[in-house]
Amino acid sequence: MKRRTVLRLGGAAAVGASLATVGLADPADAQAELALSVDGTERELGVEEAISAVVLDCSVEWAYDVPDGVTPSTVVVELAAGAGDGLTTVATSESPSLFGEADGSESFEADLIETGVLTADQVRSGVDVTVEARLRVETDSGDVIAQATAEDTAPVVAETESVNATKYGSVGGSGELRIEIA
């Protein structure tokens, strides 16, 4: 599920636990910024409960500024996630852009189990999930004129509540000790 909301960020792109700025373009002074902060989660499961989803709900703030004379046509924002080596793109937003300077926010929601990023066993064992936001600004011909990435890592843990066996079982009986002589 994807929701798109364009907002004026002002100085908000500089806020967040992780901020990356990379200006990569043919013109030397093109700039792009992303802000991303991801919180971890911990949950206790009942004895009979199973993990059905791990949902990444994320808002990515972005901004870019290209030099005069450079005309962008498309802004692409991607969200990728992974545990361990490698990241998998779990959501993408693409929108037209005709302005040399723009900023906004993209909201994404993705199930990391459904997309194959995580397994329920990984979550039960506890896993650090890396989330990466990517921004690309392209021209009509597909040339990338500005891009940036921002990354954050958050723990995900689901523990099964322990069962107190003394609550569910009992033992008893009667007996005697006797001495026998041969």
Q: Model segments located where?
A:
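Terminal disorder- and signal-encoded targeting elements
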Residues: 1-182
